[in-house]
């Protein structure tokens, strides 16, 4: 029987199924990644973001769609990774907002959620670029809104959305020249389609299980010349209520530092994503409004170089990789970065930031020369 409406349990099921399908296929999405930076991590970032949302709703049973949607939104925002991940979190956060005060959601509420998701995602991106996941989501939501009848079931709505999303995805190379030059479609839009396919499968009774990650040599999309991409800088600030947060001011300041800027804020936290060559300056701008809940800095030039080295040597890890490490190999560097830290928390943070070797500084924070040389 077709579902005319969904409750909290069914919402959790379809979101989980879509997320798992994306996780199982994220390497194919990585292989499409050329914009905004060809660092091969769009699929990894999107699946990591969605699985964070899944973790936030996993233990919710027999809850109204409002409660599941609210938990999903916060989980996605807190776990959002990369430009594509933050945009994806906003698509689903806006989607969930249409469920406020609802125990169940029918097709009109579902369609309204798809439209609100687009509005919220566009609002979070400082300079929206067409030919990306934004375009795919917008055109698909518009088509669902126009052609889904008031008495449609949820599966019909998603099928209309999916068909238009696929058509829109095929048009992305005409909107974004770098895609056409590389012979690919937009990776973020492709990832969104995989999620929707998984959601529809759940409504049809096909439930996916997480598959064992397989070794994979990333597909290379090289660019001519020597290019520096800078640092993918992300952080969440726990806003200080005594410090007046000014989103417009922060955005203006970040614009001077870089691009691919996404800023999302509510009454408690602010999530920032920016590509910049001066990540420290970006962190300082954020910290004026509170303290860091999380932060991540990745050298995108190094990421791209490692993908090239990986493809040339066909060297890859045999151990089960993490989403971030799935395309990472140990490459010889001219220089290595060693940090001296004290405590497991700092150790984990610096490791996440890509430090090559970490020395436990102990109480004195003064390691010997031998300690440094042997690191």
Labelled PLM ranges:
Residues 1-375:
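N-terminal loops that bind phosphate or other acidic moieties
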């Amino acid at each position: 029987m077709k579902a005319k409406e969904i409750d909290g349990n069914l919402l959790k099921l379809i979101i989980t199924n879509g997320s798992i399908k994306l996780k199982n296929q994220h390497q194919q999405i990585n292989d499409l990644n050329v914009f905004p930076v060809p660092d091969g991590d769009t699929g990894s970032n999107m699946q990591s973001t969605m699985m964070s949302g899944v973790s936030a709703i996993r233990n919710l049973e027999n809850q109204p769609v409002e409660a599941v949607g609210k938990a999903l939104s916060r989980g996605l925002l807190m776990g959002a990774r990369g430009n594509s991940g933050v945009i994806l979190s906003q698509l689903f956060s806006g989607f969930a907002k249409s469920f406020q005060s609802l125990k169940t959601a029918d097709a009109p509420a579902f369609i309204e959620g798809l439209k609100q998701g687009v509005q919220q995602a566009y609002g979070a991106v400082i300079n929206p670029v067409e030919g990306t996941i934004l375009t795919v989501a917008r055109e698909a939501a518009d088509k669902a809104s126009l052609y889904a009848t008031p008495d449609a079931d949820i599966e019909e709505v998603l099928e209309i959305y999916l068909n238009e999303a696929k058509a829109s995805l095929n048009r992305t190379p005409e909107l974004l020249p770098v895609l056409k030059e590389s012979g690919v479609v937009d990776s973020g839009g492709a990832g969104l389609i995989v999620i929707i396919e998984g959601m529809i499968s759940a409504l049809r009774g096909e439930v996916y299980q997480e598959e064992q990650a397989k070794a994979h040599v990333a597909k290379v999309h090289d660019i001519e010349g020597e290019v520096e991409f800078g640092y993918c800088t992300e952080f969440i600030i726990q806003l200080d209520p005594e410090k007046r947060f000014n989103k417009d001011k922060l955005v203006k300041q970040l614009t001077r530092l870089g691009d691919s800027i996404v800023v999302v804020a509510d009454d408690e936290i602010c999530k920032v994503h920016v590509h910049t060559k001066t990540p420290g300056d970006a962190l300082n701008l954020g910290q004026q409004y509170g303290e860091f809940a999380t932060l991540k800095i990745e050298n995108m030039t190094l990421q791209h170089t490692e993908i090239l080295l990986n493809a040339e040597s066909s060297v890859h890890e045999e151990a089960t990789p993490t989403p971030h490490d799935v395309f990472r190999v140990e490459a010889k560097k001219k220089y290595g970065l060693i940090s001296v830290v004290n405590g497991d928390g700092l150790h984990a943070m610096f490791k996440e930031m890509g430090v090559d070797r970490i020395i436990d500084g102990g109480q004195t924070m003064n390691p010997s020369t031998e300690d440094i040389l042997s690191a």
